[in-house]
């Protein structure tokens, strides 16, 4: 990537005040506000502070007595920030829909997908604007195969483990507050993750160690 390209994940990482880790940095927050349309950033921060965001983990190993919550945070750190997870972590990112009777919203930052109406709306708009001769892949995904153009940015990145190419979803075409909120949480820094999950305790990390309960979680999402 060009040196002029903004690395959003590094900006997200600076959201927590360096002098007081119990507060957000107002300067960085104000800067990010103007970088996203439709007040996306404000809505994402509101989501992170709403107590409506959940990370469910199929917990086969880290169900330790006495310190379960801390160990689950360590699992997320290993998976998203240290890359030291020994096995593929099975997790689901869920947002409680504020509309009565509506199913939970499923968010997948790894594949840049959300089941909310906002995501579907802008995805279909991008689809309608696509020329018949254009591939949808080319319209929505930025592919980088020149190592000199590689970026350290992790925001909207697809398949980050590839060594030969980089792929980024064009979030300026399709994005929602749910994807942005979970990206801020999981594609920024350990400090930001712990700020919302431990310090403020607004995002809940929940272990599921029963496969039947894990399957029921998916059924509830579909319903």
Swiss-Prot record:
Membrane among keywords: no
GO CC annotations, alphabetized: nucleus; Shu complex; site of double-strand break
Keywords per UniProt: DNA damage, DNA recombination, DNA repair, Nucleus
Top-rank lineage group of the source organism: Eukaryota
Primary location recorded for the protein, binned into one broad class: nucleus
Cell compartments where the protein resides: Nucleus
Gene Ontology annotations of biological process type: DNA recombinase assembly; error-free postreplication DNA repair; maintenance of rDNA; positive regulation of single-strand break repair via homologous recombination; recombinational repair
Subunit structure, interactors included: Component of the SHU complex composed of at least CSM2, PSY3, SHU1 and SHU2.
Function: Plays a role in a RAD51/RAD54-dependent homologous recombination repair (HRR) pathway to repair MMS-induced lesions during S-phase. Required for error-free repair of spontaneous and induced DNA lesions to protect the genome from mutation.
UniProt family annotation: Belongs to the SHU2 family.
Protein name per the record: Suppressor of hydroxyurea sensitivity protein 2
Organism expressing this protein natively: Saccharomyces cerevisiae (strain ATCC 204508 / S288c)
Lineage of origin: Eukaryota, Fungi, Dikarya, Ascomycota, Saccharomycotina
Gene, per the UniProt record: SHU2
């Amino acid at each position: 990537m060009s040196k002029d390209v903004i690395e959003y994940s590094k900006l997200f990482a600076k959201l927590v005040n360096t002098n007081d880790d119990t507060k957000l940095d107002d300067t960085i927050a104000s800067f990010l506000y103007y970088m996203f349309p439709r007040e996306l950033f404000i809505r994402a921060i509101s989501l992170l502070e709403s107590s409506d965001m959940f990370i469910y983990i199929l917990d086969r190993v880290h169900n330790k007595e006495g310190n379960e919550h801390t160990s689950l945070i360590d699992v997320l750190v290993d998976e998203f920030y240290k890359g030291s997870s020994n096995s593929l972590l099975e997790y689901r990112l869920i947002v409680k829909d504020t509309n009565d009777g509506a199913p939970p919203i499923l968010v997948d930052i790894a594949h840049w997908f959300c089941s909310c109406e906002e995501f579907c709306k802008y995805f279909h708009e991008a689809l309608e604007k696509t020329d018949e001769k254009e591939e949808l892949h080319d319209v929505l995904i930025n592919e980088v195969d020149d190592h000199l153009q590689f970026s350290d940015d992790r925001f909207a990145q697809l398949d980050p483990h590839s060594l030969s190419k980089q792929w980024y979803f064009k979030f300026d075409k399709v994005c929602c507050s749910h994807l942005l909120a979970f990206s801020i949480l999981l594609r920024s820094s350990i400090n930001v993750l712990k700020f919302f999950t431990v310090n403020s305790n607004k995002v809940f990390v929940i272990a599921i160690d029963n496969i039947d309960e894990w399957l029921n979680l998916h059924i509830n999402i579909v319903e």
